[in-house]
Amino acid sequence: MLQLQDVSMTFNEGTPDEKKALRSINLELKKGEFVTVIGGNGAGKSTLMNVISGILTPDIGNVFINNQQVTYLPEFKRAAYIGRVFQDPMAGTAPSMTIEENLSMAYSRIRKRRLKLGVTKKRKDMFREYLLTLNLGLEDRLNAKVGLLSGGERQALSLLMATFTEPDILLLDEHTAALDPARAELITRLTEEVVQKFNLTTLMVTHNMQQALDLGDRLFMMDAGQVIFDVKGEEKQQLTIEGLLQEFQKRRGVQFESDRAVLG
């Protein structure tokens, strides 16, 4: 489904500010795998997501989706393969447009169809059906401006827009971090439901170690541009935060007393 072969990325190469963001990353995700990704600031998590999505082109290495070479395919051409939800609820939506217009824009972009000024009754009914799954009452507010929605509502809409056409890969970039606990719990539940419903291959970056343990069936720990720990299945299910800290300590040779020290 998704393969990264010897992917490396360096920023400001040859200058005093040189930063090796990714170092020889080799990964393979199978169809339907749900992978959580943890690591401190500067570990390479966001760069990894940007390389997969096409925002960045790696200096070295290759990216494959469904066995197709996409390393040099720009972001807008990967939209048919990839859905993405960002940390900022406003990043995945157009706040000055209505819910209906946002959904229509996402549908047209991913389906490679021209965006029409009018929306047919059939498509409105389809949008309402999808919005019903959120249980937020948004199906009755199609003409509401997205900028007037709460952060949780906007993020739920972003999640829906990223997944309702069943992309090959779903990228979640700390998509609950900016929400209050109640809304974060809601988006987490919706994420689990939609990933399971569509059997989506998912990569989710989080700074919450417990969330990384609770969600998904595989976990990556990143540090200094490398995946230093990869665990899945029953071994992941048995992991605790203390166990993760111990794994980080073994690989870094540094002792940490809390997850904040690792993720900060």
What are these regions (language model features)?
Residues 38-40:
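The feature captures the beta-strand-to-loop junction immediately N-terminal to the Walker
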Residues 61-69, 229-231:
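Conserved ABC transporter NBD signature motif
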Residues 226-252:
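Conserved beta-strand-loop-alpha-helix hinge in the C-terminal portion
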Residues 69-83, 91, 113-116, 120, ...:
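ABC ATPase NBD coupling module
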Residues 206-207:
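H-loop/switch region of ABC-family ATPase nucleotide-binding domains
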Residues 162-163:
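ABC ATPase C-loop
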Residues 53:
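Helix-to-loop junction immediately C-terminal to a conserved catalytic motif
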Residues 1, 10-24, 74:
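A short, flexible loop at the N-terminus of ABC-type nucleotide-binding domains that lies
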